[in-house]
């Protein structure tokens, strides 16, 4: 069983590695920003345009508009998608990469090839997606997108894919698990923000909740294909 991250931020990369749910070499989306809309279209295109220079642009992206904070980053315009206006960061960003540095470009190519091979082989796959909170947050729409994505990718590669959706609300610490339709859904509640400008970008203030998440995840993983 492969465990792969498909977005939206590198928070999951930190936490899933800390919990030993993912291990080994970094995968394609571990250090990128992407929406499920962009990932869907990228896979539908068989990854062919991920580094197509026609779509690459170096921009000063406004990551925290409320604080007037921006960062210069490479993006792929073709996959910077928000088809229903529900994402806080509608961008496909090579966040920790310089897409025109040859060594880093080669790294992206290797990661793309490795990621694609795991989709294509015979092992089933767990796909982890963190839906980042924001003013356009729409839980029903993200469930619809996740279900559509699961159907699409399972049919494309003719094997089973499980979607593990993670969201975060403000409040007293709690972790809720539900299976809704075909999606394994974990909702974290905590007084600590995961989207602020402080250093809690990796959710480390809620490591205790992620430890509980691992226990619950291991229970359900025994019962899914």
Locations of the language-model features?
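Extracellular glycan-modifying ectodomains
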Residues: 1-225
């Amino acid at each position: 069983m492969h465990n792969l991250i498909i977005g939206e931020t590198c928070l999951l990369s930190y936490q899933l590695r800390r919990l030993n749910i993912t291990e080994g070499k970094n995968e394609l989306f571990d250090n990128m920003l992407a929406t499920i809309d962009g990932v869907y279209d990228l896979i539908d295109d068989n990854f062919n345009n991920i580094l197509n220079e026609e779509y690459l642009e170096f921009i000063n992206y406004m990551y925290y508009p409320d604080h007037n904070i921006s960062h210069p980053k490479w993006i792929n315009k073709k996959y910077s998608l928000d088809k229903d206006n529900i994402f806080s960061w509608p961008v496909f960003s090579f966040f920790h990469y310089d897409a025109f540095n040859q060594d880093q470009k080669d790294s992206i190519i290797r990661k793309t090839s490795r990621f694609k091979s795991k989709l294509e082989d015979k092992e089933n796959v767990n796909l982890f997606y963190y839906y980042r909170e924001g003013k356009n947050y729409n839980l029903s729409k993200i469930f619809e997108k996740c279900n559509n994505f699961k159907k699409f990718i399972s049919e494309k590669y003719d094997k089973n894919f499980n979607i593990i959706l993670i969201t975060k609300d403000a409040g007293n610490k709690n972790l809720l698990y539900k299976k809704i339709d075909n999606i394994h859904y974990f909702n974290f509640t905590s007084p600590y923000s995961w989207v602020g400008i402080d250093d809690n970008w990796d959710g480390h203030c809620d490591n205790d909740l992620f430890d509980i998440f691992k226990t619950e995840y291991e229970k359900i993983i025994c019962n899914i294909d």
